[in-house]
């Protein structure tokens, strides 16, 4: 029985899923918007939002926790130097999911996941 088990399996084993979301979280922090399938976007939200909340309080311990979850110093630096201060006054809800149709090959529902207060630089790069 799968009672009270949260999270989606996404037809992957645990280590594959963990690595995939670690990479996707890094891409979202780096580019501030990514395109993926809707279920992956909904699950990625559960990974990225706690990272941004962690980045709102800058400490060595929090930086080490963020590094343990992302394994990328560049991402940790952006989280704590840019995103933490940017979202300091916002109590959660740092990401937005926008549905964008269906993929041509397999008709999978696609979505953009983005950070809500994207910088103008990131918006120009996305277009």
Curated annotation (Swiss-Prot):
Q: Name one GO cellular component term.
A: cytosol
Give the matching Pfam families: Ribosomal_L17
Q: What are the GO BP annotations of this UniProt entry?
A: cytoplasmic translation; ribosomal large subunit assembly
A GO molecular-function term, please?
A: structural constituent of ribosome
PROSITE patterns in alphabetical order: RIBOSOMAL_L17
Xref: SUPFAM superfamilies: Prokaryotic ribosomal protein L17
Q: Which Gene3D superfamilies match?
A: Ribosomal protein L17
Q: Does the keyword Ribosomal protein apply?
A: yes
> Which controlled-vocabulary keywords does the entry list?
Ribonucleoprotein, Ribosomal protein
As for what it does, the entry says: Requires L15 for assembly into the 50S subunit.
> What is the similarity comment for this entry?
Belongs to the bacterial ribosomal protein bL17 family.
Instruction: Share what the entry says about its subunit structure, partners included.
Output: Part of the 50S ribosomal subunit. Contacts protein L32.
Q: What is this protein called?
A: Large ribosomal subunit protein bL17
Q: Which organism is it from?
A: Escherichia coli (strain K12)
UniProt gene name: rplQ
């Amino acid at each position: 029985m799968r009672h009270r088990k949260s999270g989606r399996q996404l037809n992957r084993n645990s280590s594959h899923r963990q690595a995939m979301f670690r990479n996707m979280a890094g891409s979202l922090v780096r580019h501030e918007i990514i395109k993926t399938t809707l279920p992956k976007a909904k699950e990625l939200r559960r990974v990225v939002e706690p990272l941004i909340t962690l980045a709102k309080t800058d400490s060595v311990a929090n930086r080490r926790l963020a590094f343990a979850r992302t394994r990328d110093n560049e991402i940790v630096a952006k989280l704590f130097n840019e995103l933490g201060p940017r979202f300091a006054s916002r109590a959660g809800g740092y990401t937005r999911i926008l549905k964008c149709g269906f993929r041509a090959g397999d008709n999978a529902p696609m979505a953009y996941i983005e950070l809500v207060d994207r910088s103008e630089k990131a918006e120009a790069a996305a277009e």
